[in-house]
């Protein structure tokens, strides 16, 4: 019996089709690492961000005060210490009210709180389905970038304009 001989000019086809499917896949493999700094310019950790049905934010933080803290995406890609007011208001392309529990809708930059342990560390994953990496007005890059801001207290999820979350204690610029 003779072995089956493949025409070598077509030997690449079994590999080409799966690669073309991957190239057309809408899932982005790009990731951005945002370093967060406190009012003294000291790093307090990072946020690994990637797109997956919104933006996934994986927090790995240290040297923060114990307790529940708010984290928001703010309008400007600027983090001037000590108060980080340069980051501007919450990212809000639809001009909605503040708070995930607000019946009138919420800012695109509003997100769930996270908890810092007694050791000053926090690891958390937050998903924000109201923002993206695209080119529309919900893109976190639409204004030349945005900022990730950690607040001293928890967000109450309803009080306009910022949820009574207290001072801005850490900030990181989000840019491509």
Regions found by a protein language model. Give the residues of each.
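Bacterial N-terminal signal peptides that target proteins for export
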Residues: 5-15
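Bacterial N-terminal signal peptides
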Residues: 14-23
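N-terminal leader/targeting pre-sequences
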Residues: 24-176
